[in-house]
């Protein structure tokens, strides 16, 4: 029995693009000197409401990026985007990284820095105000941004949870 549900996302059917967020060089000290390795954080998305992130580790930069892309394709989530922005304000925390995202009017642009900008660009969000608080570690900032985007509830979900119609939700 397969576990595929109506909400499962097949990354093979999406036109995913990738964006490199951060490359880190690590060193292992061995008898003959230092062995260098690399890890890469990559954000993948179709700029139409699907986004994911991946972490790849390898001895070469290109291999680490390729592994990150493959990992990112396995972690794709759907983001509800309304008129180019998010439906409501979000505060998400992962580790000591905290990300605040606020919806913005059309024409505002994507006001975000570093890792959060990459996540929102790949998701297809065009107008949003963000602030990254706490740790600036790209690993945790990306995870906090994705966690926040996952926690977005669109109007249909809210209406379903409250056992009301869509119009009743907006009237209250």
Swiss-Prot record:
Keywords: Ribonucleoprotein, Ribosomal protein, RNA-binding, rRNA-binding. InterPro entries: Ribosomal_Su5_D2-typ_SF, Ribosomal_uS5, Ribosomal_uS5_bac-type, Ribosomal_uS5_C, Ribosomal_uS5_N, Ribosomal_uS5_N_CS, Ribsml_uS5_D2-typ_fold_subgr. Gene3D superfamilies: 3.30.160.20, 3.30.230.10. GO terms for biological process: translation. It comes from the Bacteria. GO terms for molecular function: rRNA binding; structural constituent of ribosome. SUPFAM superfamilies: dsRNA-binding domain-like, Ribosomal protein S5 domain 2-like. One of its GO terms (cellular component) is small ribosomal subunit. Pfam families: Ribosomal_S5, Ribosomal_S5_C. Residues 16-79 form the S5 DRBM domain. Part of the 30S ribosomal subunit. Contacts proteins S4 and S8. With S4 and S12 plays an important role in translational accuracy. Located at the back of the 30S subunit body where it stabilizes the conformation of the head with respect to the body. The N-terminal domain interacts with the head of the 30S subunit; the C-terminal domain interacts with the body and contacts protein S4. The interaction surface between S4 and S5 is involved in control of translational fidelity. PANTHER family: MITOCHONDRIAL RIBOSOMAL PROTEIN S5 (PTHR48277:SF1). NCBIfam families: rpsE_bact. Belongs to the universal ribosomal protein uS5 family. This is Small ribosomal subunit protein uS5. It comes from Chlorobium phaeovibrioides (strain DSM 265 / 1930) (Prosthecochloris vibrioformis (strain DSM 265)). The lineage of its organism: Bacteria, Pseudomonadati, Chlorobiota, Chlorobiia, Chlorobiales. The gene is rpsE.
